[in-house]
Design a protein with these regions (language model features):
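Structured binding/interaction patches within domain cores
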Residues: 2-154, 159, 163-164, 176
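Signal-transducing coiled-coil linker helices
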Residues: 167-168
Length: 177
């Protein structure tokens, strides 16, 4: 995911949001899916507006209504970090070091990657393809680091499908217990 920092900040938040959407479709029950997908829609709409102060509390209230279980924890945690990424992207840091939006987007990716039912290769493929598509579309549209994303960028993106959940990865240490 080294290319993540090379795309605009709101595009980074969109990468995180799209991964969340895939995780939500795979991990949440249908009733909870609608609430979580609503938060994803809010995050996506916030990537189309640059320089606004974002109220994340209403989205956090919606997320708090969803009962956390082992099977949906990664999706809910990733939604939290995607929300943080878009909020951070709206107030870029003037300090040196890692950009808060990039850090939050990476934490979003890590939280989904921590689920043992999801292949690391699957995560790498969907995230890197989103980064490549967004980098091309942003470059084509002349979008800079802290610019909002245009409709042109969104038209370049394919729809998100659910991640494929498999059997939890086997830990070789468990064989010796």
């Amino acid at each position: 995911m080294s290319d993540l920092s090379k795309i605009p900040l709101l595009a980074q938040a969109l990468v995180a949001c799209r991964l969340c959407r895939r995780a939500v479709l795979a991990m949440l029950a249908e009733t909870d899916q609608q609430l979580a997908l609503g938060v994803c829609d809010v995050i996506e709409s916030m990537t189309k507006i640059a320089g606004k102060t974002i109220d994340r509390d209403s989205s956090k209230v919606v997320l708090s209504r969803i009962h956390r279980t082992r099977s949906n924890q990664a999706a809910l945690q990733s939604l939290h970090w995607a929300l943080e990424a878009v909020v951070a992207a709206h107030r870029p840091s003037a300090l040196y070091g890692d950009e808060p939006a990039t850090v939050a987007a990476m934490r979003c990716i890590e939280s989904v990657s921590d689920d043992p039912r999801i292949s690391a290769l699957q995560i790498a493929i969907v995230v890197e393809s989103d980064i490549d598509l967004l980098a091309f579309a942003c470059d084509e549209d002349g979008i800079q680091l802290s610019d909002s994303l245009s409709d042109h960028v969104f038209k370049r993106l394919p729809p998100c499908h659910a991640l494929t959940l498999g059997e939890p990865r086997r830990n070789p240490e468990d064989d010796y217990r």
